[in-house]
Regions:
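HhH-family (HhH-GPD) DNA N-glycosylase catalytic core used in base-excision repair
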Residues: 1-304
């Protein structure tokens, strides 16, 4: 699996400066304010300071460590249903994919599929097309654009991708690898321009584009209005009319501005917990955890 969690340790292999870097993250015991201990492992004898700095940046992005939840909790206090949801998952931070490319590929892969099937498909993609093989049981890194650009569509078909999705993923990989499309530049673009760029890509419609704004660009005000799962959850918890679609979801999201995306994540967690796919433990305090460990620089470094 790309992301691994054993109940106390989160593990993932990141591609940092074109090299795999294996990351493990734990919440350290002791202080009242949450502190995360991070261990990095690379293939070279030493890790450069630039590697550590980039790994820190990516972890802060992917784990949502810089997100201030105070405004969301104040909003939730004004609505009993939202308040109960927020309290149930107090301290939950919005995750983000390490790269916009990974977010778009996730969106394409998960179109018209259940979350479980989509995740299975993406894990198979990583297992067969990771840019490098990690040792010691570490997770496979998500494939780079350069790696997927060299892949034949039939290879993805054999993993379970549809013909259209296979072509869309490989075309996107080639566009990014050659510089024809710069997805990371979308981080500096306003929503409307980012959406226009995304929907112009093969295989990307409104849902995929809005999903990418939320999961790839960290636009936490965006609630993907075409998301069928979100619509079902809104009906279950907020009384959204049966048959109500994008416009009705957009109206609700406007009332929650600028936290529609945070509501989306809480609804997803609630649905997973209700289905027994997530075990609710003692969630972290609402304040931001800091990235630290026992050594100077905030990260323990090892070489494999």
């Amino acid at each position: 699996m790309i992301d691994q969690w054993d109940g106390s340790c989160y593990r993932r292999t990141l591609v940092i400066r074109e090299r795999p870097l294996e990351v493990s993250v734990r919440q350290l015991p002791g202080p009242a304010s949450p502190v995360l201990g991070v261990e990095l492992r690379g293939s070279s004898a030493t890790l450069a300071d630039e590697d550590v700095a980039e790994a820190r940046r990516v972890l802060e992005l992917t784990l949502g460590l810089g997100v201030d939840l105070g405004g969301f909790y104040r909003l939730a206090d004004g609505d009993e249903r939202l308040r109960n949801l927020a309290r149930r998952f107090s301290g939950m931070r919005p995750p983000c994919f390490p790269t916009v490319f990974e977010a778009v590929v996730n969106a394409i892969a998960c179109q018209q599929l259940s979350l479980a099937v989509g995740i299975h498909l993406l894990n198979r993609l990583a297992e067969h097309h990771a840019p490098t093989r990690s040792g010691g049981g570490w997770p496979p890194a998500f494939p780079t654009p350069e790696r997927l650009a060299e892949t034949d569509p039939q290879d993805l078909r054999e993993l379970g991708f549809s013909r259209a999705k296979s072509h869309a993923v490989i075309l996107l990989a080639r566009q990014v690898a050659t510089g024809e499309v710069d997805l990371e530049a979308l981080r500096d673009e306003p929503d409307d321009r980012a959406l226009a760029t995304l929907v112009a890509l093969s295989g990307v419609g409104r849902w995929s584009a809005e999903y990418t704004l939320l999961r790839g660009l960290g636009r936490h005000h965006v609630l993907p209005g075409d998301d069928v799962g979100a619509q079902n959850n809104l009906r279950r918890l907020f009384g959204l009319d049966q048959g109500a679609g994008y416009d009705a979801v957009a109206d609700l999201a406007q009332a929650w501005w600028p936290y529609g995306g945070l509501v989306y994540f809480h609804l997803l967690l609630d649905a997973l917990a209700t289905a027994g796919d997530v075990i609710i433990a003692a969630f972290a305090a609402a304040e931001s955890p800091s990235v630290a460990s026992e050594v100077a620089g905030g990260v323990r470094r090892t070489a494999s």
